[in-house]
Amino acid sequence: CSLSLSIMVTIVVGLWAINELTYDNFYPDGDRMYRVVQNFELNGKSTRAATSFKPLGEIAKRELPSIEQMCRIVSRPMGVTFHNMVHFGVPSLVTDHNFFSFFGFSLKEGDIETAFSGTNNAIITESAARKYFPDENPIGQRIVSHGYDFFISGVMYDIPRNSHIRAEVIFPMFGHFKGWGWDSGFYFDTYFVLSSDADLKLIGERLAQINRTGLSNFLKDATNEVGLELVRDIHFSKTEPGFDSAVKGDKSFLQILVFTALVILVIGCINFTNLFISTAFIRARSIGIKKSQGAGRRTLILEFYKETAVYVFISVVGGLLLAMLTLPVFNNYTGSTTVLDFYNPQLYVFLFCLIIVTILIAGSFPAFRMTKFGIIETIGGKFRGKKMSAFQKALVIIQFTSSISLLIIVFFFGRQIDTLLSQDLGFDNKNVFYVNGWGAFGADYKSLRNELRKNPAIADVAMKQYDLPLRMGNGVGVCNLDGDEVMLIDL
């Protein structure tokens, strides 16, 4: 039982770690694909942003020959109308027409060459197709966002879970997304595929020059450095949350959980070894009899490993069943999307390595120690000497020390989580409900507010550009102060 529990923890944490470490490693030009990152320093505040102004990408593509491809993305939840019903907070992308060829995403339905070529074409994922069009073909269906009509021209395969890009609906550049220039719209994630001999430092300096030219005197009171980060490094990169829509990971948290899982696995293996030792008298007599019949030590060691392998295999099956029950809770806690995908060959490679490591840890001491004694010692029981007892005591001490250490760590983690959950947010969040998708209300907001206020269960209604104040925006505006135009960064 203890071995199954420790293996369950190792499986859950191991699959999650594999998912974290393989983020964005599947793009066709992943070794040459970069995203623009910028460092702004304004009024003593430093900000690292993964967003850019819309013109930066197109100018850079035109002027820098080492940039082979360029693609821009605005990622945000949007209000989208399906079948005359508005759905708020739909994960959406507004992007350039080369999005699919750039990232290598393919379509399940529709022609990849033409499906995203029009100005009013939209692509949805297969999960979105099942969600919004469960009993009909979504191709050709009309959807609406921000007052613009679109027609679904393709269904793409779901974006892999270990991608920093998340979306259900893909839109082309439209409306104000098209018109944004240097004076607004600091929302674009800009990606480049570079030539193999590209100089990253030189490109960063050239991008900063393009920024300074485009922003002219808006950057006179600010410093701006532009760099490039490999797309495969995005998941663990450090950027301001309001200026990066990518799903982020934490290497320190990853290392802590992996170390904890390994400690738990070792504890389970030690407990298993102690159980082997507790039946040592019976096993020793059996070893002595086999040796008297001509069995060699190597043969006996292999038998121990075979017996251990049977127990470990049963424990792995039990651990898998427990992992299936535990993963939803773990995902809710970590915010991950880890799944037990039995069609993924990585799962079987991981399980094979886990089984081998567990067999070696759990079975090595009984196999080598108990087969060391001679025929007379084992049959006569002389093997139960001081060395065996000392080693067993050491295992028990290690087991209890590790267990107590884990309990202390869990206690302090629990206290930290309780502290975070009990922090004063500056407002009362009880009985407060919000809808993410403010832009979809448009001019109808006042009418909607008046209708909602008629409901006796609703005390009041208000609108805010971003989520209830737990998330800030990412934008740049221009304001005229005392006759001077200055840049304001919405942090």
Predicted regions and their residues:
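Membrane-proximal extracellular/periplasmic loop immediately following the first transmembrane helix
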Residues: V13-G79, K178-G179, D183-Y191, G204-R206, ...
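Short juxtamembrane loops and helix-capping segments at transmembrane helix boundaries
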Residues: L21-G30, N39-E41, R166-F177, S237-S245, ...
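Short, strongly hydrophobic transmembrane alpha-helices
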Residues: C1-L21, D31, S389-Q416, F427
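Membrane-helix entry/capping segments
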Residues: F26-Y27, A208-V263, F281-I282, G296, ...
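Intracellular coupling helices
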Residues: C1-S2, G268-Y311, K372-F383
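The feature marks short, hydrophobic/small-residue-biased sequence motifs that occur predominantly
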Residues: P55, L64, I73-V74, T81-D111, ...
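Small-residue-rich transmembrane alpha-helices
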Residues: I11-L15, G227, T308-I375, R415
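Mid-to-C-terminal secondary-structure elements
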Residues: T95-E109, N121-S252, S447-L491
